[in-house]
């Protein structure tokens, strides 16, 4: 695991482990033997590894909140919007109270960093993630409305979004915005969702995956975000099948086929599988991978 990405990876994995997969901490299935060779199983009388992972991650995240209320990419670094949004989102969905000091400080950071135009950093992904965090915290409707208006304005005539307002169409940023809209509850009848989904659908590769540049090798990370964004509008069964075929033997996912498993990519991939209501054990195998590679510090 790369140290300079550890905080971002942790938060992504934490989000995934607790709410993206739809598995309760006390699920009976947590006492089953691991289906992946090399990953240890455990007895029903022992504390489930998933529970340990979640609790350790919660503690680690809270301990590394900065004084300004935000969270950094790496402990001791400067706060940034993306990690702060993910931290708020994940903690609340894990049962952290919206009125707690930790959440209130995080919300304050997002409130203080919104730009006058309604965006966060003039960045479409940062903006939608901040909106999800504030909506999850059930606060600041006026700020959220202002951010939503900016996102609608930033959508290109093609239906896509770029990184910033009036920047070139980008598959990953379009997918991230649509995934955020999905979390916010917007459906096909919301024009930005249907237009954006149509643009993404037209950008598909021949193998049912997506890449940053159409026609290049399909990218598991990009495709996993796209799947989440398309789910409210399109049937994604073929994309779920494509994704499952690329899972590594250890249960994780790499960026491309046969590449080493990566925690962040695995987390995003399982969020995509959850969006597709995958009926098999693919998500479960990935969870075992993520719990097995957790560092001692949480």
Cite the ranges covered by each PLM segment.
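Bacterial N-terminal signal peptides that target proteins for export
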Residues: 2-10
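Bacterial N-terminal signal peptides
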Residues: 10-20
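Sec-dependent signal peptide cleavage junction
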Residues: 22-31
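An alpha-helical repeat/solenoid feature that recognizes helix-turn-helix modules
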Residues: 30-56, 70-102, 116-149, 157-198, ...
